Swiss-Prot record:
It is found in: Cell membrane. Part of the ABC transporter complex OppABCDF involved in the uptake of oligopeptides. Belongs to the bacterial solute-binding protein 5 family. One of its GO terms (molecular function) is peptide transmembrane transporter activity. The keyword Protein biosynthesis does not apply. A lipid is attached at C23 (N-palmitoyl cysteine). A lipid is attached at C23 (S-diacylglycerol cysteine). Residues 1-22 form the signal peptide. InterPro entries: Peptide/Ni-bd (IPR030678), SBP_5 (IPR039424), SBP_5_CS (IPR023765), SBP_5_dom (IPR000914). The keyword Transport applies. It is a lipid-anchor. It comes from Lactococcus lactis subsp. cremoris (strain SK11). Its main location: membrane. This is Oligopeptide-binding protein OppA.
Length: 600
C-alpha cells in the first residue's frame, strides 16, 4: 500500500474511495476472497465468471481539477494522481503488509528492525528492476531521502519523524553532503541498505510510520536533472520509470494514463493487456457509469451514492475510509529555513475560546445526515475508527452543535454583540473572518454557506475567500507554499491517512502540512509520547493516543469534522476486485470476464 504519506483529498464533505492506490501499489500476497464487510457493503466482488485472456480495463478518477502527474512520492501531494499511479507501482512502494498494516515478507523489499543496534535493514529483491530493465539498487532507495531532505528539490515532506535518522538533519540543513545514517553494506549498486536511527519507535513495525521511507527513485535515470527542475521534468511526470506490474505508455497531462504490462515486473504477470485511467468530472461521472463507459470510478462522493447504488451492471463495494476531514485555523507561518511552524499571527483565533466556539457552532451532524447518504458520521476525534485499538468513545469533540456553549465561550472572552449589526466586537474591532473553502462535490458551496450562516448565529462574521470557493489545486498551492498565506482564517481539509496512526507528519511543530501552523509544547509532548519507548506497551500507547485526542479537542487548533465509509461502483465483468487493505497484488490479479462491459 501507498502508506508512507498522508495525501490531500478534494472532498471535505465525505471522503471518497482511494481504491487501488493502496491495493495495487506494492502488489502483495493474494487477492482476498473472504466475505469481508464494511457497514452494509461487501469489501470484495466475487465474480462467478473467470477472467478472459487479456482485455482492457477502463477506470476513472472523479475530480474537478486536473491530475498533477508526479511519479516521485517525495515530490507529490495530489490524491488523484496517488490513486492513478497504482498500476505502475503506486509511486514505487516496496513493502508488503497484512490487513492490520504491519510489515510482512514477500514484497519488492523486506525490512528487518533491530532494537539493540537501532537500525532498519532493507533488502531489495534480486529480481527487482525498473521498467527499462535496469536494476533497482540501494542508491535508488537512498535517493528518495535526498529528494525529500535536500531543500533544492522543493519537497514538502520533511518532518520531525525523518529527523530521527542519524545525519539526515545535518544533510537537510546543508551541514553535510551525504547522509551518514544511511549506508550500503554491498555498495551503492547492491541490494541492501542499513538505516541508523537515533532511537527506535513503537510504530516502526507499521507501514506509513514516517520514520523510514517505503519507496525508491531511479537515481541513474534522474541524476543529471538539476534539483530545481526535477519536479517538472518529463522523467518524473510523463516519461517515468516504474516498478509495478504495469508501466505508463502514455501520460496526457492533467487527463489520463494509458498502462501496458511491464515486462520486467518481478511478480505475477498481469492478466490484462492494458489499463486506461482517466480523470472524469463530477458532472459527468454518473452518466459515464450509466452508459457503461468505465469498469469503476474512484473518488465518487457520498452525495452521488443514491444515483449509483442500483445501476444495472454494477456492484457497489465499500470500505472504512482510512481518512479524516477537519477544519483548520490560520495561526502563524512556516519557517522553511528552520523547518518549524511559528504561531505568531495576529488574529482572534489565537484565543482557545474563539476556536472552540466556532467549532461548536457548526451543525456537522445535520450536514452529514442531509448530504452523505449515511456514508459519513461526525468525528469525535482526529483518529478514524479503523484504528479502533487507539480510539475511545469517551473522547468528546464537536459532533453536536451547541450554540449556547459557543455564545457562552465568546461572552467569557469579552466579545460583545452589536445588536445593530448582529456581529460581535471587542476593543472596537468586529469578529470578522475569511473562510478559504474549496471546490469539492456538488454540495460544497451549499455546505460552506450553511456554516457561514451557523457562525452568524453566534455573532461571528465570516466571508468566503475572494467571495467564492477556491479551485482545489489552487487551494493546495495556497496552503502548502511556505511560509503560508496570511489572507485566510478558516479552511477545511481532508486527508487520506498513513496506516500508522501517529500524526507527527500532520501536526508536529515541524510538519509542513500543519496548515494552521500551531506550535504547542503539550501537543508536541503528546505526539512524542505516542512514539516513545514506553509506547511499546499497547495499553500505554492507547492511553497516549486518547490523551492526544482529548488535548487536540480541548485546544481546538483543528476541529474534526467527519469519519466516512468509502464506496466504489464496480462493473460486473471485473474479476478479482477487492478493497481489502491486506490485498497487495490486485493490479496483477484483476481481469475482466468479457470484452464488453456488463449492462445488467
Amino acid at each position: 500500500m501507498n502508506k508512507l504519506k498522508v495525501t490531500l483529498l478534494a472532498s471535505s464533505v465525505v471522503l471518497a474511495a482511494t481504491l487501488l492506490s493502496a491495493c495495487g501499489s506494492n502488489q502483495s500476497s493474494s487477492t482476498s476472497t473472504k466475505k469481508l464487510k464494511a457497514g452494509n457493503f461487501d469489501v470484495a466482488y466475487q465474480n462467478p465468471d473467470k477472467a478472459i485472456k487479456g482485455g482492457n480495463l477502463k477506470v476513472a478518477y472523479q475530480s474537478d481539477s486536473p491530475m498533477k502527474a508526479q511519479w516521485l512520492s517525495g515530490l507529490s501531494n495530489d490524491a488523484t494522481f496517488a490513486t492513478m499511479s497504482g498500476p505502475g507501482g503506486g509511486q514505487d512502494g516496496l513493502f508488503f503488509t497484512d490487513s492490520g498494516f504491519k510489515f510482512i515478507k514477500g514484497g519488492a523489499a523486506d525490512v528487518a528492525l533491530d532494537k539493540e543496534s537501532k537500525t532498519a535493514t532493507i533488502t531489495l529483491r534480486k529480481d527487482l528492476k525498473w521498467s527499462d530493465g535496469s536494476e533497482v539498487t540501494a542508491k535508488d532507495y537512498e535517493f528518495t531521502y535526498e529528494t525529500i531532505a535536500n531543500p533544492a528539490y522543493g519537497s514538502d515532506r520533511w518532518t520531525d519523524s525523518l529527523a530521527n535518522i542519524v545525519g539526515l538533519s545535518d544533510y537537510h540543513a546543508g551541514k553535510a553532503k551525504t547522509i551518514s545514517g544511511i549506508t550500503f553494506p554491498d555498495g551503492e549498486n547492491g541490494k541492501v541498505i542499513k538505516v541508523q536511527f537515533k532511537e527506535m519507535k513503537p510504530g516502526m513495525t507499521q507501514s506509513g510510520n514516517g520514520y523510514f521511507l517505503e519507496t525508491v527513485a531511479p537515481y541513474q535515470y534522474l541524476k543529471d536533472v538539476a534539483p530545481k527542475d526535477l519536479a517538472s521534468s518529463p522523467k518524473t511526470t510523463t516519461k517515468p520509470l516504474v516498478t509495478g506490474p504495469f508501466k505508463p505508455e502514455n501520460v496526457v497531462a492533467g487527463e489520463s494514463i494509458k498502462y501496458v504490462p511491464n515486462p520486467y515486473y518481478w511478480g505475477k504477470k498481469p492478466k490484462l493487456n492494458s489499463i486506461t485511467y482517466e480523470v472524469v468530472s463530477t458532472a459527468k461521472s454518473v452518466a459515464a457509469l450509466s452508459s457503461s463507459k468505465y469498469d469503476f470510478i474512484n473518488g465518487m462522493v457520498s452525495s452521488q451514492y443514491k444515483q449509483v447504488k442500483n445501476l444495472k451492471g454494477y456492484k457497489v463495494l465499500g470500505q472504512q475510509a482510512m481518512a479524516i476531514s477537519l477544519m483548520y485555523y490560520n495561526l502563524g507561518h512556516y519557517d522553511a529555513k528552520n523547518s518549524i511552524n511559528v504561531q505568531d499571527r495576529k488574529t482572534p483565533l489565537q484565543d482557545q475560546n474563539v476556536r472552540q466556539a466556532i467549532g461548536y457552532a457548526r451543525n456537522v451532524a445535520e450536514v452529514a445526515n442531509k448530504f452523505s447518504n449515511g456514508l459519513s458520521t461526525p468525528a469525535n476525534s482526529l483518529i478514524p475508527p479503523i484504528f479502533k485499538q487507539f480510539t475511545s468513545s469517551s473522547v468528546k469533540g464537536y459532533e453536536k452543535q451547541d450554540l449556547d456553549k459557543a455564545n457562552k465561550l465568546l461572552d467569557e472572552d469579552g466579545w460583545k454583540l452589536n445588536k445593530s449589526t448582529g456581529y460581535r466586537e471587542k476593543d472596537g474591532k468586529e469578529l470578522s473572518l475569511v473562510y478559504a473553502a474549496h471546490v469539492g462535490d456538488a454540495n460544497a458551496e451549499t455546505i460552506a454557506q450553511n456554516y457561514i450562516q451557523q457562525w452568524k448565529k453566534i455573532g461571528v462574521k465570516v466571508s468566503l475567500y475572494n467571495g467564492k470557493l477556491m479551485e482545489f489545486n489552487s487551494w493546495v498551492d495556497h496552503m502548502t507554499t511556505p511560509p503560508g498565506a496570511n489572507d485566510w482564517d478558516i479552511t477545511d481539509g481532508s486527508w487520506s491517512l498513513a496506516s500508522e496512526p501517529s500524526q507527527q507528519d500532520l501536526f508536529s511543530a515541524s510538519a509542513p502540512y500543519n496548515f494552521g501552523h500551531f506550535n504547542d509544547s503539550e501537543i508536541t509532548k503528546d505526539l512524542n509520547d505516542i512514539d516513545s519507548a514506553k509506547s511499546e506497551n499497547p495499553t500505554y500507547r492507547k492511553a497516549a493516543f486518547v490523551k492526544y485526542q482529548e488535548d487536540m479537542n480541548k485546544k481546538a487548533y483543528v476541529v474534526p469534522t467527519n469519519f466516512s465509509l468509502s464506496y466504489t461502483p464496480v462493473n460486473k465483468r471485473v474479476v478479482g476486485m477487492t478493497l481489502d487493505y491486506g490485498a497487495m497484488d490486485t493490479w496483477s490479479e484483476i481481469g475482466v470476464s468479457s470484452a464488453k462491459l456488463a449492462t445488467k
